[in-house]
Amino acid sequence: NRRPHFLYPKSRLIRSLLPPPHYGPLSFHDMFQPFLEMIHQAQQAMDVQFHSPAFQFPDMDLLREGEDDRAVCKEIRHNSTGCLKMKGQCEKCQEILSVDCSANNPAQAHLRQELNDSLQVAERLTQRYNELLHSLQTKMLNTSSLLEQLNEQFNWVSQLANLTQGEDQYYLRVSTVTTHSSDSEVPSRVT
């Protein structure tokens, strides 16, 4: 039974993990140099496309203002309901405020006041609802506790009723037994 030589070699080759001496010592930077060059080439190719006249960012003026302003302005453009809170952040925000949230418009001021009043009423109703719910939960807990006590004290009544039912469910069979004691001083008992 002879095995093929290429699957089970008789001897092993020992390879060095170090590069051949004519390449010089290998550093961390050298290992990733081809990858870094590829990224650099991709960035250069993208820069050429971005600087061409056909390509323009829609908010190029915001890119020059700074990171914080840019994020705020972008957020306000997507959701202009926050413009009142952000009105002092940048020029674009102030423009949006004047168009979307016109603070000087009396009709909008009246609507804002109605909204605030409605929110306050909703908050009061929510608090009242929570109070009523808590009260109901307390009463339900007390009622269930009372029912458990009644069940413990008077469970024998329902058991007796179940045992004394005959064929007719509305007719209870009750038997009386009179006990007499041999002692004449103890009265007779009916059970």
Curated annotation (Swiss-Prot):
One of its GO terms (cellular component) is perinuclear endoplasmic reticulum lumen. One of its GO terms (molecular function) is misfolded protein binding. PROSITE patterns: CLUSTERIN_2. Glycans are attached at N79, N116, N142, N162. It is found in: Secreted; Nucleus; Cytoplasm; Mitochondrion membrane. InterPro entries: Clusterin-like, Clusterin_C, Clusterin_CS. It holds the Pfam family Clusterin. Keywords: Chaperone, Cytoplasm, Cytoplasmic vesicle, Developmental protein, Differentiation, Disulfide bond, Endoplasmic reticulum, Glycoprotein, Membrane, Microsome, Mitochondrion, Nucleus, Phosphoprotein, Secreted, Spermatogenesis, Ubl conjugation. The modification Phosphoserine is found at S184. It comes from the Eukaryota. Transmembrane segments: none annotated. Its main location: secreted. It is a peripheral membrane protein. Proteolytically cleaved on its way through the secretory system, probably within the Golgi lumen. Proteolytic cleavage is not necessary for its chaperone activity. All non-secreted forms are not proteolytically cleaved. Chaperone activity of uncleaved forms is dependent on a non-reducing environment. Polyubiquitinated, leading to proteasomal degradation. Under cellular stress, the intracellular level of cleaved form is reduced due to proteasomal degradation. One of its GO terms (biological process) is negative regulation of amyloid fibril formation. Functions as extracellular chaperone that prevents aggregation of non native proteins. Prevents stress-induced aggregation of blood plasma proteins. Inhibits formation of amyloid fibrils by APP, APOC2, B2M, CALCA, CSN3, SNCA and aggregation-prone LYZ variants (in vitro). Does not require ATP. Maintains partially unfolded proteins in a state appropriate for subsequent refolding by other chaperones, such as HSPA8/HSC70. Does not refold proteins by itself. Antiparallel disulfide-linked heterodimer of an alpha chain and a beta chain. Self-associates and forms higher oligomers. Interacts with a broad range of misfolded proteins, including APP, APOC2 and LYZ. Slightly acidic pH promotes interaction with misfolded proteins. Forms high-molecular weight oligomers upon interaction with misfolded proteins. Interacts with APOA1, LRP2, CLUAP1 and PON1. Interacts with the complement membrane attack complex. Interacts (via alpha chain) with XRCC6. Belongs to the clusterin family. This is Clusterin. It comes from Mesocricetus auratus (Golden hamster).
